[in-house]
Amino acid sequence: MRLWPAIAISLPRVTPPEGCEIDGSWVPGGTKVGVSQWSAYRSERNFARADQFLPERWLPEGEEESFINDTRAAFQPFSTGPRNCLGMNFARAETRIIFARLLLDFDLELLTGRDEWEAQKVYIIWDRCPLYVRGFGRQTRHKRPANLWLPWDTHGSSASNERKLADLLS
């Protein structure tokens, strides 16, 4: 989501009526402004080795020295403020479950090079090219918790919050 944000355009905001200063430049009131997520996420001002996929950059602060000065607040894939994405919490929960299932059950191998991804067309959203991945089933099963507590009550009873993890992920 950092290297290839879902939205390719900037998410607009309007400056206050009295105007304001943005990054050292005066902007008159009522002006539509925006920051490209792609530019912010690829900027060395915000992230060390910004063009590289390095998941260790997200480890808790202090664990990876080379990323200690990263501006993590610049990473806002769902926008920010009162008009941010309504589906943000659902998308994060869904992504965690899907990735957990994939990583527990498969060893993955990327089959295409990065060149195709660098040449993607963009309009308002990305015209994505396929990402070809080969999955190898794992021989050993990881021990999973028996139950998963969901943070919502679907039908008014607390019992409905408990779901078998195997059922949820199958």
From Swiss-Prot:
Keyword Metal-binding found: yes
Superkingdom of this protein's organism: Eukaryota
Alphabetized PANTHER family for the sequence: BENZOATE-PARA-HYDROXYLASE (PTHR24305:SF29), CYTOCHROME P450 (PTHR24305)
Enzyme class: oxidoreductase
Pathway, per record: Secondary metabolite biosynthesis
Pfam families xrefs: p450
Keyword Metal-binding set for record: yes
Family as reported in the entry's similarity comment: Belongs to the cytochrome P450 family.
Cofactor(s) needed: heme
Binding site for heme: 85
Protein name: Cytochrome P450 monooxygenase oryQ
Keywords for the protein's UniProt record, in alphabetical order: Heme, Iron, Metal-binding, Monooxygenase, Oxidoreductase
GO molecular function annotations of the record: heme binding; iron ion binding; monooxygenase activity; oxidoreductase activity, acting on paired donors, with incorporation or reduction of molecular oxygen
Gene: oryQ
EC number: 1.-.-.-
